[in-house]
Amino acid sequence: MNQTDKSHQEVPSYLHDEPPEGSIKDHPQQQPSMLSRVTGGIFSVTKGAVGATIGGVAWIGGKSLEITKTAVTSVPSMGVGLVKGSVSAVAGGVTAVGSAVASKVPLTGKKKDKSD
């Protein structure tokens, strides 16, 4: 009976049904209430994060005293100049949101007149 007990103990941890203790630390689970994207490039605000933009780049900060997590998301632009300048807001005393869109630059140069 000692041999069966000994062979049962020699089975590596990855062959067991239970995950090893360190595997959960390697892949942290996503927080369920950060930010969810809806159609049209508009972001809905959920608990812990604030952010909304139509086209361009959005910087989103959550209220946290540890490390501020920043999400940079590029959304296809729906038109020229939908968002101009920057938008900032404070919610809960610690959250800030800003967004900006670069103006559209024409790809073709000036057309020369036939007289030139």
From Swiss-Prot:
Transmembrane segments: 40-60, 78-98
Disulfide bond annotation, renumbered to this chain: none
Free-text function comment from the UniProt entry: May be involved in the growth pathway.
InterPro entries (alphabetical): UPF0444
Name of this chain's protein: Transmembrane protein 263
Recorded topology in the membrane: Multi-pass membrane protein
Similarity-based family: Belongs to the TMEM263 family.
Region feature Disordered, mapped onto this chain: 1-36
Pfam families: UPF0444
Alphabetic keyword roster: Dwarfism, Glycoprotein, Membrane, Transmembrane, Transmembrane helix
Localization of this protein: Membrane
Gene Ontology cellular component annotations, sorted alphabetically: membrane
Residues carrying covalently attached carbohydrate according to the record: N2
Biased composition regions of type Basic and acidic residues, renumbered to the chain: 1-28
Disease: Defect in TMEM263 may be a one of the causes of autosomal recessive dwarfism in Cornell K-strain white leghorns. A nonsense mutation truncates the protein and probably cause a dysfunctional protein. Autosomal dwarf chicken display small body stature by short shank length, with 30-40% reduced adult body weight despite normal hormonal concentration of GH and IGF1.
